[in-house]
Amino acid sequence: MSFSGKYQLQSQENFEAFMKAIGLPEELIQKGKDIKGVSEIVQNGKHFKFTITAGSKVIQNEFTVGEECELETMTGEKVKTVVQLEGDNKLVTTFKNIKSVTELNGDIITNTMTLGDIVFKRISKRI
């Protein structure tokens, strides 16, 4: 299954609690909570390029499944991690005590990030 495409955020759960837990300033949390960001994914075999645009903020991450990479987080911090592919529709990684699972089902992509007992879920639809 190919992840390639553009996806627009449809809904999210626990945005504010998760962003507070990772240390994002309140001002940025309030600015970001209603932005319907767009994610563009380009997949070439096991190589992925993610471009996430939320308002004026753009995050670009590139990685190859199973190889160590450096990813930029929502706070702008760069972390080293390894992204794994589970089945043919689920990307999984862990960094800084956060487990991130990105799952593709048809035209819907669900990103679930878990930090302790806080589960932040973003649901986006292919556009």
Swiss-Prot record:
Forms a beta-barrel structure that accommodates hydrophobic ligands in its interior. Its main location: cytoplasm. GO terms for molecular function: antioxidant activity; chromatin binding; fatty acid binding. GO terms for cellular component: cytosol; extracellular exosome; nucleoplasm; nucleus; peroxisomal matrix. The modification Phosphothreonine is found at T51. The modification Phosphoserine is found at S11, S39, S56, S100. It comes from Homo sapiens. It is found in: Cytoplasm. The modification N-acetylmethionine is found at M1. Transmembrane segments: none annotated. One of its GO terms (biological process) is cellular response to hydrogen peroxide. Plays a role in lipoprotein-mediated cholesterol uptake in hepatocytes. Binds cholesterol. Binds free fatty acids and their coenzyme A derivatives, bilirubin, and some other small molecules in the cytoplasm. May be involved in intracellular lipid transport. Belongs to the calycin superfamily. Fatty-acid binding protein (FABP) family. This is Fatty acid-binding protein, liver. SUPFAM superfamilies: Lipocalins (SSF50814). The modification N6-succinyllysine is found at K31, K36, K46, K57, K78, K90, K121. InterPro entries: Calycin, Fatty_acid-bd, ILBP. Keywords: Acetylation, Cytoplasm, Lipid-binding, Phosphoprotein, Transport.
